[in-house]
Amino acid sequence: MVLSNVDAEEVNMDSSMELEESSQEPLRADNYEEIYNSLVHHEPDLEEAAHASYSWVVKNFSTLEDKTYSPLFKAGHTTWRIVLFPKGCNQTEYASVFLEYLPQCKVEAIRKYEAELAAGKTPTIDPEIVNDETYSCCAQFALSLSNVQDPTVMQINTSHHRFRSEVKDWGFTRFVDLRKIAVPTPEFPVPFLENDEICISVTVRVLQDPTGVLWHSFVNYNSKKETGYVGLKNQGATCYMNSLLQSLFFTNIFRKTVYKIPTDNDDSRDSVAYALQRVFYNLEKQREPVSTTELTRSFGWNSFDSFMQHDIQEFNRVLQDNLEKKMKGTEVENALNDIFVGKMKSYVKCIDVNYESSRVEDFWDIQLNVKGMDTLEDSFRDAIQVETLTGDNKYYAEGHGLQDAHKGIIFESLPNVLQLQLKRFDYDMLRDMMVKINDRHEFPLEIDLEPYLSETADKSESHVYVLHGVLVHGGDLHGGHYYALIKPEKDSNWFKFDDDRVTRATIKEVLEDNYGGEPAGRAKGYNGNPFKRFMNAYMLVYFRKSRLDHILSPVTAEDVPFHVRNTLDEEHRVVERKLLEREEQQIYRRVRVLTTDGFKKYHGFDMTDFSASDDDPVLITTKIKRNANIWDLQKHLAGLLNRDTSGIRIWLMTNRQNRTVRVDLPLDKKTILVDQICDMHIRKDMDMRVYVEFLSEHNQLLADFGATDDNDFDTYIFLKIFDYETQQISGLADLHVSKNSPISSLSEWIREHLKWSSDVPITYYEEIKTGMVDVLDPNASFEKSEIQVGDIICFEKKLVHDSSSDTSHPYKSALDLYDFMAHRVVITFEPRYSDDTNNGVFDLVLTTHTNYTDMARAVANKLNVDPNYLQFTMAHLPSRTPRSVIRNPSKFTLQNAIPSTYSHNQNVVMFYEVLDITLSELERKQLIRVHFLSNGISHETQMEFYVDKEGTVEDILRQVTQKVPLNAEDASRLRLYEVYNHRILKSHLPTDGIYDLNEFSTAYVEVTPKEEQMQLKTDDAVSIVVQHFFKDLSRLHDIPFYFVLLRGETLKDLKKRLQKRLGYNDTQFSKVKLAVLQAQSFGKPYYLTDDDEVLYGELEPQSHILGLDHPPANGSAQYHGMDQAIRMK
């Protein structure tokens, strides 16, 4: 026997599969049972529909044609045949063998073909061209070649495939070497091919495909068509966010609540609620995966943020907090609490005396242990287990002293939507590191949670919960992939939402595949893909069964805010139009048409702005078939313009080297094709741009100039006029002139046409390009002035009086207006901080010459504020994020804010702030940012304010007392210290100057603990720095702080005070190892293990630091404190 998994051009072989021999006897080609069992062993989890084996004895092998078919055979309700290429397929060195699945229509065609041949008739059908475009069939199979007389002389290859109309057969191009097929080998004394005959056998295992995607290539897969749902695009590392968003989207009551948040006047660039509404509506209506870029931009994230994976629980809370703030004062205030919030009671109850201390708190989700817990029920029992406090851990009960007590938590109420966070990441004490817990942890489709409620909880309604969402993580602590399994409706199937792809899912995929650990019932010796062990559930979403109809009530069009629906429907229509246009571009050429009438309506530079939208009144946008000729184009345009075809002339407009677009040549050859003209003169992807000259008006102009026909004229020009009163430049006429005539020859016609007196002086300019306009000599000829076809001449009535004092007319001549147009820039002004709700986003048209004073005055007029209170910050483009404050207003012009890549079609962003003090005062002030530690070191609040640059730390502390409600005694104990990279740089005295603060550090302000202040007044205490780290000193985290060492205090007693200062519970503090660190070096920590050790007198505050070695609260210690928490505007 030859056992082979040959790689063929058409095949991805299952190289891990091996056929096991049950005895010492060699495997036989006719031992179908053993071959079948080996197929099952390789894919034991797949559900079988049918299986069959079949052998085909091929006779006269050497005389066969290039392609030969076996008789048909059945496997259950499916029909198959073997396809043999005896001389090879796409090569000549190997025989090729394939397995083909036959849809019923093809089976019937083959039967009919064979019947007609048997009856001596000419076949009326070729069965090989008959096909069914809709079928698919999944199967494992083993194909073997063997000697007809000796089945042990064999070669066997195995594979699997999704048979479909695009790839109807599958097998092996290089099955057996034709040079060796008919000769004995060292392994086999007889050849495969003997007496010109050979046996080909197949065992096929037809498999169920309940999800429709088994072994799917996903080429041209359409989630909307196959499942009715669409996915979300991954921006780089946003799969964790996508899985949560899909879960929230299918929590219908949440989606309805989000839709009720008022966002009529919001901008999706900075409103999370509005951006989320848009994402949700797109998920309802789009046929393609939905982008989340707009949503993350509303968070204030840039592309770098989108490539960082975050904790899903933290992201969920930050998102909900943001929405809650937006809901305040609206009809949906507290609506999220009604959906997600339950109550739990933490208690300590004395055993021997009647005393209980308890606190009832809201929870948004429940964190449950996985390690050591076989089932979800075990995790709930673990969560509410009672801890007994005895011995050294007795509880101090006020009025009763130290008492034995029971400590624990119990649930008072559970929410309608219950989000369970499975603690898949935890600290491993033995390995001394954070690890992912891949233990098997089973969860049910339905669970009764009433046993975990307190005795006083309301149990009048059932607390049975139904599983509706499983969020899955695959990978380890350092990264991986996330997706969601969701049941969208009460009685629907389950679906897998994997970023932009949505597929149907089985119950096994929902439950068994995500329990983690080794799957139950795994066959002994199975050597399949071990990565599955690392794919497991990390968040479960249960809906209260009695409230299912409420939670999943259908979302209707009326639930969607009108402005969201209207705006996005229009955006979708625009997208559809663009798709249609792209399709039409293969047949049609878009044509932008400028006429004399349009030219007269235009007031900018050049002939017109061809980047304008299709509804621009200056231009006409139409289309013409690419194979149409110029005469067809002329008839088409004449009809659009309601003119006779003989009354118009078409001119092609092209790009000049100076980046202007001008009339170039007349399209007089009527038989030439539109595409031929375009290929010769314009770029392939560019619209065809034409100017339509009205000949009736042209003939009148000829008469006005005393000419008889066109031969008297050889230059075609365009006239513009600058009107001093309206402060506009406008198109006036298109003229044919003689190149030998002087420029002044235009004057008589102009005066007559505009009814000016004959003595009005006229000044002429040539509009060459942006920023270049030349004065023309009226006595020079058109030829000498280098005026050619398509050139633009602008003229004006020369002012005869001094207009310098006329402020209502800033442009004194055409040159002034041309200069403005050349340096014109649109600035988009945005509030520097998103919480500035009093002011909005607006555009102003200014010039690159605009200085700071003029810009401030223009913005102040718009905002109705004093310009002296405005401060501006330039922006990064294209991210539209703040870059740097304008520090030197006296030297600033808008040119400083314009990037070199700026084009006149884009807006430049500038951020503004309305200050509480004037800008001049601000120059004497310094912005101070501090973090106030309000509850020990466990809570911090960031605040900002200005203080005098010459001020002191006392000024900072005074500002803090104005922002935080403190009594006089606490205010007197405030202290400020600086931290950099989680190390204390310096503790400041109130008299220290502001200039002493390091601009790169973080300033922390706290109320010095009263007992610490009292202790330090004695000789029995010393203050020392405490610093957090994880395993080594390059991995610092959390906020360092000051702590007091007491004379004679043992390490055991110190730990109790330290735990209280940190605010850690027993579980958290059990992970902390105390160590002595060298203050001025990165030497190895000296770990403290003797509880009787006394640190006072052993540690010097200037030389030592008390180190706390433990994993950070967020589960990911970063080097040098570079970890970034999730932030949203």
UniProtKB/Swiss-Prot annotation:
Q: Which PROSITE patterns match?
A: MATH, USP_1, USP_2, USP_3
- Biased composition (Acidic residues) is annotated at 7-23
Database matches in InterPro entries: MATH/TRAF_dom, Papain-like_cys_pep_sf, Peptidase_C19, Peptidase_C19_UCH, TRAF-like, USP7_ICP0-binding_dom, USP_C, USP_CS
Q: What class of enzyme is it?
A: hydrolase
Tell me which Gene Ontology terms the entry assigns under biological process: mitotic DNA replication maintenance of fidelity; negative regulation of error-prone translesion synthesis; protein deubiquitination; proteolysis; regulation of protein stability
Keywords, sorted A to Z: Hydrolase, Nucleus, Protease, Thiol protease, Ubl conjugation pathway
Q: Classify the source by domain of life.
A: Eukaryota
Cite a single GO MF annotation: endopeptidase activity
Localization annotation: Nucleus
Ranges for domain USP come to 230-545
- Please describe what happens when the gene is knocked out: Decreases cleavage of the sde2 propeptide; simultaneous knockout of ubp5 abolishes cleavage. Simultaneous knockout of ubp5 leads to abnormal splicing of introns featuring long spacing between the branchpoint and 3'-splice site. Simultaneous knockout of ubp5 leads to a growth defect and thermal stress sensitivity.
Q: Which GO terms describe its cellular component?
A: cytoplasm; cytosol; nucleus
Name the Pfam families for this protein: UCH, USP7_C2, USP7_ICP0_bdg
- Give the residues annotated as active site: C239 (nucleophile), H481 (proton acceptor)
Where would I find the MATH domain in this sequence?
51-204
Q: Which family does it belong to?
A: Belongs to the peptidase C19 family.
Name of the protein: Ubiquitin carboxyl-terminal hydrolase 15
Organism of origin is: Schizosaccharomyces pombe (strain 972 / ATCC 24843) (Fission yeast)
Q: What does the organism's lineage look like at the top? A: Eukaryota, Fungi, Dikarya, Ascomycota, Taphrinomycotina
| Name of the gene | ubp15
